[in-house]
Amino acid sequence: MERIPSAQPPPTCLPKTPGLEHGDLSGMDFAHMYQVYKSRRGIKRSEDSKETYKLPHRLIEKKRRDRINECIAQLKDLLPEHLKLTTLGHLEKAVVLELTLKHVKALTNLIDQQQQKIMALQSGLQAGDLSGKNIEAGQEMFCSGFQTCAREVLQYLAKHENTRDLKSSQLVTHLHRVVSELLQGSASRKPLDSAPKPVDFKEKPSFLAKGSEGPGKNCVPVIQRTFAPSGGEQSGSDTDTDSGYGGELEKGDLRSEQPYFKSDHGRRFTVGERVSTIKQESEEPPTKKSRMQLSDEEGHFVGSDLMGSPFLGPHPHQPPFCLPFYLIPPSATAYLPMLEKCWYPTSVPLLYPGLNTSAAALSSFMNPDKIPTPLLLPQRLPSPLAHSSLDSSALLQALKQIPPLNLETKD
């Protein structure tokens, strides 16, 4: 059985060591023992301090995050609306920071530009200080401009003194126009250039009217020409000219009028000529022209003797379009016997539009019911030649001696 040393008394054989007193222990060093004990207690205290430090650190981190979120929310509210619309949906924190940075850069660039302009203005004022002469010149220019403006305003108000609805906008427009004229230096040229314009507009309708008349301008549907008269028939053209038909003008336009005169067979009229024909001719259809046919003797006379006469139809075998009512001025009454003998086998009725007595004498022996409507000539202007009472009386006597004209028609 093993011995337990603590339970057994010390052996007697061993010498008894003297006991240590408190005074002897005062000089001994126990530092190593103290350090070991101290280190054990420090470890326990550091663990406790970590546990106690975790709680305020969490609070501090939470407060820091709260401050960051609050600042981002304020930046989001301060951002312009056009920057907010660039992104769709909810604005994240990173997006808010990016937009804020972009906006700050734009503001910085704007501020830099403004500062550069301010510096340029300051340097310009410092480099180019106005001297006394420059100030006087500027004052003189200002005074002259003010006087010019005041003069224009007074003139404009004087011109429009009677107008009640005068507006300030009209005055401002007038001043702007005057300033532009002064700057361009063309105040004297513009009235000269603008003056002929109304004349052009006034002349334009007459030109259009002339062009719209077409080739049928001088065409008379009652009396038609086929070709130019010969040299021996100048009296007929003179009579036509004196009657107001414009024979001299028809001589020059004869070639251009021939296709329109020859269109009697095919009825190829232009629009303007058709309108003039409707106004001057009767409304009878072309088939009723057979009522106007003359006797065989008269047809032979038309085809043989007077083929070149300008008062007959276009074709020698075609019956004449109308009876030969010639318009002769009163001064030509001396040639009546020659006309009766040479031009027509019987008496020729003479009619002058300017004389009412001749029309009365003609109506005395002519029945107006028997006269077809195409035979009535349109009223023309009187002859420019002055006719005396002697001529009119001679013409009246000649008309009274004319026998009634045979107007019976064939079926």
Swiss-Prot record:
Residues in cross-link Glycyl lysine isopeptide (Lys-Gly) (interchain with G-Cter in SUMO1)? 279
> Which CDD domains does the annotation name?
bHLH-O_DEC1 (cd19749)
Please give the GO cellular component terms listed in this UniProt entry: cytoplasm; nucleus
Per UniProt, subunit arrangement is: Homodimer. Heterodimer with BHLHE41/DEC2. Interacts with TCF3/E47. Interacts with ubiquitin-conjugating enzyme UBE2I/UBC9. Interacts with HDAC1, SUMO1, RXRA and BMAL1.
Question: What is the protein name stated in its UniProt record?
Answer: Class E basic helix-loop-helix protein 40
Residues modified to Phosphoserine: 235, 383
Domain Orange residues, every copy = 142-175
